[in-house]
């Protein structure tokens, strides 16, 4: 699964997701993409599950680009532990996704296969998404 190789600090504040995405809103690599429509924290497991669903549907043809990276450590205290005594340990890594952000791009397959692959990938994500494609020039 995706996670940073090293970080400056082990733990982070929770933070909030405000506004729309500034960058990463256009297709840069592939002909088809999956665009986020809601703000949400997407975990590394969800990104990996979506990637597997997409590549399985494409039958290993074409190419997949993951345009988001889980760089936010999410901490949790063990169950039945009293409050206090410091912050919990890092449980998993997540990525803050803003509306308008391209999450996945694919290329090298027909539109109907791409549409179905991204639909199956979107089912693994906790947000509403939209299928987009590059405008023919």
UniProtKB/Swiss-Prot annotation:
PROSITE patterns: RIBOSOMAL_L16_1, RIBOSOMAL_L16_2. GO terms for cellular component: cytosolic large ribosomal subunit. SUPFAM superfamilies: Ribosomal protein L16p/L10e (SSF54686). Keywords: Ribonucleoprotein, Ribosomal protein, RNA-binding, rRNA-binding, tRNA-binding. GO terms for biological process: translation. One of its GO terms (molecular function) is rRNA binding. The keyword RNA-binding applies. CDD domains: Ribosomal_L16_L10e. Binds 23S rRNA and is also seen to make contacts with the A and possibly P site tRNAs. NCBIfam families: rplP_bact (TIGR01164). Belongs to the universal ribosomal protein uL16 family. Part of the 50S ribosomal subunit. This is Large ribosomal subunit protein uL16. It comes from Chelativorans sp. (strain BNC1). The gene is rplP.
